[in-house]
Amino acid sequence: MSTQAKTPTIGPTTPEQVAWVALLRAHASAMRRFNGELLSAHELTLNDYEVLLRLAQEPERMMRRVDLAKSVLLTPSGITRLLEGLERCGYVERASCSSDARVTYALLTDEGYEKLRQASSTHVEGIRSHFAGRFSVEELETLGSLLCRLPLDGPEDEGCGA
């Protein structure tokens, strides 16, 4: 009779563990690919691209820096460092609020808008080749619906509806 203890199974074994690990691995792999492609072709990180895109979506191509940080899921110090780099490149400018000196805005410049336009084709091609092209339309709709159930920051957030 063996006195050795049974070796526990290591790694994801339940459906929830398998799904969680698959999501983490897919996310990490996609971020590396998208970052690499944008850096190689346009000298932008994926976070740079997301900030330029978010600013371009605003009617005046401008947002309060604190709101921009929240919209791209960065900390206030993280958005400050990122914006400093984009400011040095001439893609973003800092603007003050005339009614509240504590408030500063990030403003997308024409040069930043052009850089975003150029990088968009690379990003869209990456999404199609590394992600969307691997699923049917129905699968993409299901995946989008499932992922939108997840909160973005905390229990009060509404996932994709926030």
What are these regions (language model features)?
Residues 2-7, 84-142:
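Charged, amphipathic alpha-helical coiled-coil/dimerization segments
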Residues 32-75, 159-162:
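N-terminal helix-turn-helix DNA-binding core of bacterial DNA-binding proteins
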Residues 30, 34, 72, 115, ...:
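Alpha-helical linker/hinge and terminal dimerization helices associated
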Residues 1-42, 89-91:
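N-terminal leader segment of winged-helix/HTH proteins
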Residues 24, 28, 53-57, 120, ...:
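Short, locally clustered residues in the helix-turn-helix/winged-helix DNA-binding domain
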Residues 65, 83-84:
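Short, hydrophobic-biased segments on the C-terminal half of alpha helices
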Residues 1-14, 137-162:
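C-terminal regulatory/oligomerization modules of transcriptional regulators
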